Amino acid sequence: MGRQPLSCPFFFAVGLRPVAEEAEVRALVDFYDTVHLAEVVRLNEGFVSAARYELTEPLDDDSVPSLLAVYGIGSEDAARRFLDRQGERRPVYTPGPPLFYSAPVVWRMVWESAGSTGVDDLMPGKMAMIGMDPAADATEAEIAEFDDFYTRTHLPEIVSGLGYDRGTRFLLWHEFTHPEPGCPRYNAVYEAEDPNPRPPGVPPLSSGPRAWEERQVRWRVKYRRAA
């Protein structure tokens, strides 16, 4: 498949929280890996790649997906065509195992890339995602300061200080499904080719503007690449 999903200008995330017997979960992930991931790319014009991730932290939070599929979208036009195909115009996919239909869908949203540091493309073995909102009462000027600090200062500090190969800031482009009170506005994604965990500890980080310091972190999750 072409560029990796998180290297694309947009990506579509589908996150499930299957709770079932091990054999049922295995049937679900096997279906994703051997049939569904490639089929979604093939049947949606402008989709260029797909990958599946499994949650490593936190394992006990039912509001975040334990199985995450991400699909790279090559352009905004392709993303808009995808929105137009929702409902009755959605592609007809190969039927899956029972858990494919019964597993709770906790995430379903499209994200737009808004700035990156590090390598242009990679095959990540692991990634971290941090969903956040700026200070609730931030003005437009403060949001601009938040964005500038986020991209120019914080992303590079995390990438270099925590051993990631790339950090990318994504903006919520469209929300289909997310637990209340809704999806955060920003999603910082940090990727590393090495799947092994890094020793614990966070290096000193720069202080940011008020909208940054008073940000609300909605979720902080880590995944390993599974397919």
Question: Locations of the language-model features?
Answer:
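Macromolecular interaction modules
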Residues: 1-227
